[in-house]
């Protein structure tokens, strides 16, 4: 009988801790979205620690903030950090699209010369490679499992 009570107590404690972790993640996400909608584009490092069950979200949100501010290099770095956490589908493709866009936005077609053409092509190939990874887009056909990633890859090919 004592063992059954202990098991029930342990299950109860684990359930409360799991609920608390999910609640903290939810509150941090809602707070970030609320501030973003109010055009308060800043991030709290507290969210990085409190969002421990989905650590990629902090970097993804921070990348969105940088992108909104026109800091495409900062956005690129944050999306790259988010991808290191290997989020599942569909987040993976969404992050790859944003990562690729942050690279493309750093390229000004008016400033491309013979001297920097190879570097520009390398950057576009980097963006394209990100879209092709994990099948978000396909190189030889239109069968990538994310239509936005496929469209962006096709635009880069042009």
Task: Tell me the role of every PLM-derived stretch.
Residues 28-155:
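Alpha-helical protein-protein interaction scaffolds
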Residues 1-2:
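N-terminal Lys/Arg-rich, disordered targeting/topogenic segments
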